[in-house]
Amino acid sequence: AIMKMDGSQQEENLEVISTGSLGLDLALGVGGLPRGRIVEIFGPESSGKTTLCLEAVAQCQKNGGVCAFVDAEHAFDPVYARKLGVKVEELYLSQPDTGEQALEICDTLVRSGGIDMVVVDSVAALVPKAEIEGDMGDSHVGLQARLMSQALRKLTGHIKKTNTLVVFINQIRMKIGVMFGSPETTTGGNALKFYSSVRLDIRRTGSIKKGEEVLGNETRVKVIKNKVAPPFRQAEFDILYGEGISWEGELIDIGVKNDIINKSGAWYSYNGAK
């Protein structure tokens, strides 16, 4: 298909799905995760990757969207998802056996046109069939990278046509022998880095404590890549155990930053009210 961009083809505003974090929506520059695009969320273990995705799923469902969760890690917790506001009974869940099966399911869901958001958790768990059927200790160099490269070539066109948001969760690995620069890299080769319109680096920066009891994590998200707005912005928010992103805490922090709320010591005041 070929078209001339002379105005006859109506240019529409970019549709987005909120992340559930006000600060992160602002950092993304467009108000959320862009539809019709691929998004990669990566970070260390227990940094809040799945929580952030489930928060976005809950926001999508709130606006009448249909969501699917491809759980390659076989670790989906419906009780926790429900606490974050996910309507579990309306969520399509798949727990595939192989990487090929997971990506085929993802492609089928996208091509159907009936799904608004697909989450793949995680790229590291997309094990090629040859590796599953082989013996422990067998060498399968580059198999997963080749699988991801082929799948993304197929997926990217369908994602644009159906205006579906596809989020890939990814893990971090260390490169051996790196003297300069960061030794960290993500799994599954380089293809996902190229095909992603947005890449988010999520890190746990500290703990939220009440006395000795740990109530949650302080979290920082950096927008490492952004094709729809300026990149390298960042957002900080709290993730409370069993509750998810602390919306009230984030609202107060943004209010203080923009001089809407006054802070003096441990007190916050707005229009004279403390």
Curated annotation (Swiss-Prot):
Q: Which domain of life is it from?
A: Bacteria
Q: What effect is documented for mutating I115V? A: In strain: P63
Q: Where primarily located?
A: cytoplasm
Give a Gene Ontology cellular component term annotated to this protein.
cytosol
| Biological processes, Gene Ontology terms | DNA recombination; DNA repair; SOS response
Name the Gene Ontology molecular function terms of this record.
ATP binding; ATP hydrolysis activity; ATP-dependent DNA damage sensor activity; single-stranded DNA binding
Locations listed in the record: Cytoplasm
Question: Which UniProt key words apply to this protein?
Answer: ATP-binding, Cytoplasm, DNA damage, DNA recombination, DNA repair, DNA-binding, Nucleotide-binding, SOS response
Binding positions (ATP): G43, P44, E45, S46, S47, G48, K49, T50
The family database entries (Pfam families) matched by this protein are listed as: RecA (PF00154), RecA_C (PF21096)
Work out whether the entry's keyword set contains Translocase: no
Alphabetical list of NCBIfam families matching this protein = tigrfam_recA
Q: Which PANTHER family match?
A: MITOCHONDRIAL DNA REPAIR PROTEIN RECA HOMOLOG-RELATED, RECA
HAMAP family named among the record's database cross-references: RecA
Chain's role: Can catalyze the hydrolysis of ATP in the presence of single-stranded DNA, the ATP-dependent uptake of single-stranded DNA by duplex DNA, and the ATP-dependent hybridization of homologous single-stranded DNAs. It interacts with LexA causing its activation and leading to its autocatalytic cleavage.
The family line of this record is: Belongs to the RecA family.
Q: What is this protein called?
A: Protein RecA
